[in-house]
Amino acid sequence: MDSSAEGSGNGGSKTAERTVKSMNVYKKDTMKNLVKDNSYVGRGIVIGKTEDGTKAAVAYFIMGRSENSRNRIFKEEGEDVMIYPFDASKVEDPSLIIYAPIRKLDGKLIVTNGDQTDTIRDFVVAGKSFEDALETREFEPDAPNWTPRISGMLTFADGDFTYKMSILKSADEAGTACNRFTYSYKAIAGVGHFLHTYMGDGSPLPTFTGEPERASIPNDIDAWTKEIWENLNEQNKISIYVRFTDLKTGAVENRMINKNV
């Protein structure tokens, strides 16, 4: 490189260094701040460990803009959660709104935004992996949005847990290929990761980009449920489900809110 080229780029390099130094890659934010300014987060998964390190925390919520999307409620079925129509007479397309977002297996908890929950369950039961299961699935066929499939799985062992998260999204505007991203985490007290389908409202809807966002996980399940629910867009939010699992005893606490009651 000649000296003139090196000198001309020096100022930009120093600016870039200052920018990088000012960034905190370990910063986490409250769920309030992560959702309050986004009118359409879509569907969201949060997984992490409470601040005191004693519980695994999972949250799943759904939002909707159309009458078909908003016509949904969460229902508990044993240790699983199902999504059903609130008014069956108004169902237009049941394929993308009726599914089990949460399923419990021995030593594992699966949470997703679609029927890939059952794909993951079936593969795990057969001795295969989270990644193997999702290699068989793609983003949703709802052109032009190509809504990504987001998934998570907690694995409990020795009084602690690890977790994986995945997003399957379209490689281009035409939906010609699927890009698959998987993230693997060791649980850290007070830290969670938040993965959601959309960056905001739009036409088409802008797909989530980047890594799962780092979120704070408090000790109080009621406070955390309220924090997320009250800061989701009032017009578009539909339901939320939160589960805390005690890492020593396995005891479970659940909170569920349905806008349709």
Predicted segment positions?
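N-terminal amphipathic/basic-hydrophobic helices that include classical n-h-c signal peptides
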Residues: M1-S22
